[in-house]
Each structure stands twice: as structure tokens, then as C-alpha cells.
């Protein structure tokens, strides 16, 4: 049963931006709330988005990691959006393109005022690669909360899963309340209620709630 204030099942495709280096030209105005999803190309980002919104093909999945180079924006309502950023770190992507993505991702995290939270997705079997940590550090430096989402949790037994979750929490403890860590399985639904609760809170920052209340008066 959905206990969140936002019905994430209502997410719908809004726009694609073909070039991450020119994000501002393609994305909606820097208003309202955006939640970004970032992760390595094999982290299961599209599957997670589809599972969280209960839509089989909202985000297109590919059997070839690194193929999706578009920034895809999904609208929850007039004020709130989910942003699916291109996967990073895939070995077969040319080095120049990797650097281009990384620079633009960093700029997006640092300059996008409406960014309310970042979900950094990592395969639970291979967490906290260098680029994952860089995304987390960039976000926290910009005072943007992070959910480190350990995907494919069904690939590990319960004991090994919790051992990994606790190890990642310990590793990221230096960031304090800015970073939370949760296991997730798109296949089994593991962690889905907690993730939706976090996303829902990000969708309701104090300033937006006050703005909407004033508009109703």
C-alpha cells in the first residue's frame, strides 16, 4: 500500500536532453523540485526507476551497459521531476566522452538550484567505486542529500547483504546525515517502501510546501 504523499506511479516521460554538456538548454526551468538518479552503467538504474514507479518501461533498459547517453526527465506533477542521468564509468565508452560526462554531471550537481536529492545507485556486489564516491562528495559539497542505493540486493544472501550494507554505512559515516544507505531489489521489491519515503520527503522541502500553501491562500 502506498503511504507516500506523492504517487510515484503517476510519473510520465517529459523530455530527453541529447547532450549532457548543454543541460540547461533542454531541461525545464530551474524551478520546483528535481531528484536525480545517477550510477554506473551496470548499476540497474533503469530497472530501479521502473520498479519504484511500477511502470515496466518508463525508463528503457538495455542489455548493453553505457548505451544510454540521454538525460531523461520524468514528471511527477507540475512542481516535481525525476531526472535519469547517463550511466558513468563503462569501460567501452571512449575516455573523452567519460570526461565530458563527469564534468557535466559535476556542473549539474553544483549549479542546479532545484535539485532536492540525488540517488546514487551501486551494485551491492561492487559498491563505492571511485566515481560513486565522487558523485556523493560532489552532492554533499553542494549540500544536496544523497541516498546510496545498493541495488540487486537479491543477488546476496541476507547475512552477506547486511554485512555489505553495514560496511558501506561505516564507509560513508563521515558524511553524517547527508547520506543514507539502503539495500534495494527491483526484482523482489526489497527496500522499496523506505526508498519511496525518502523520495517523498525530498519532494516536499520546506520552501516548496510554504510556497504551495501561500498559493492556496
Swiss-Prot record:
PROSITE patterns: G_ENGB (PS51706)
Disulfide links within the chain: none
GO CC annotation: cytosol
Pfam families: MMR_HSR1 (PF01926)
Domain of life from the UniProt record: Bacteria
Keyword Metal-binding: yes
UniProt domain EngB-type G: residue ranges: 31-205
Gene Ontology annotations of biological process type: division septum assembly
GO function terms (MF aspect): GTP binding; metal ion binding
Binding site for GTP: 39-46, 66-70, 84-87, 151-154, 184-186
Cofactor(s) named in the record: Mg(2+)
Residues binding Mg(2+), per UniProt: 46, 68
UniProt keyword terms in alphabetical order: Cell cycle, Cell division, GTP-binding, Magnesium, Metal-binding, Nucleotide-binding, Septation
HAMAP family reported in the protein's UniProt record: GTPase_EngB
NCBIfam families: GTPase_YsxC
PANTHER family (alphabetical): ENGB-TYPE G DOMAIN-CONTAINING PROTEIN, MSS1/TRME-RELATED GTP-BINDING PROTEIN
Function of the molecule: Necessary for normal cell division and for the maintenance of normal septation.
Family: Belongs to the TRAFAC class TrmE-Era-EngA-EngB-Septin-like GTPase superfamily. EngB GTPase family.
Protein name per UniProt: Probable GTP-binding protein EngB
Classification lineage: Bacteria, Pseudomonadati, Pseudomonadota, Gammaproteobacteria, Alteromonadales
Gene that encodes the chain: engB
Amino acid at each position: 500500500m502506498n503511504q507516500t504523499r506523492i504517487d510515484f506511479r503517476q510519473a510520465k516521460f517529459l523530455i530527453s536532453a541529447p547532450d549532457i554538456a548543454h543541460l540547461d538548454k533542454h531541461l525545464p526551468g530551474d524551478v520546483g523540485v528535481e531528484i536525480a538518479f545517477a550510477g554506473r552503467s551496470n548499476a540497474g538504474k533503469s530497472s530501479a526507476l521502473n520498479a519504484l514507479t511500477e511502470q515496466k518501461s518508463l525508463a528503457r533498459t538495455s542489455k548493453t551497459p553505457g548505451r544510454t547517453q540521454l538525460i531523461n526527465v520524468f514528471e511527477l506533477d507540475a512542481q516535481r521531476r525525476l531526472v535519469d542521468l547517463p550511466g558513468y564509468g563503462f569501460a567501452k565508452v571512449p575516455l573523452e566522452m567519460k570526461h565530458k560526462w563527469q564534468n557535466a554531471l559535476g556542473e549539474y550537481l553544483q549549479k542546479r538550484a532545484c535539485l532536492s536529492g540525488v540517488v546514487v545507485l551501486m551494485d551491492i556486489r561492487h559498491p563505492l567505486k571511485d566515481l560513486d564516491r565522487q558523485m556523493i562528495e560532489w552532492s554533499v559539497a553542494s549540500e544536496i542529500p544523497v541516498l546510496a542505493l545498493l541495488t540487486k540486493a537479491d543477488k546476496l544472501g541476507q547475512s552477506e547483504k547486511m554485512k555489505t550494507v553495514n560496511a558501506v554505512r561505516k564507509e560513508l559515516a563521515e558524511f553524517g546525515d547527508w547520506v543514507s544507505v539502503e539495500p534495494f531489489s527491483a526484482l523482489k521489491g526489497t527496500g522499496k517502501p523506505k526508498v519511496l519515503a525518502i523520495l517523498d520527503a525530498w519532494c516536499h522541502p520546506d520552501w516548496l510546501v510554504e510556497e504551495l500553501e501561500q498559493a492556496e491562500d
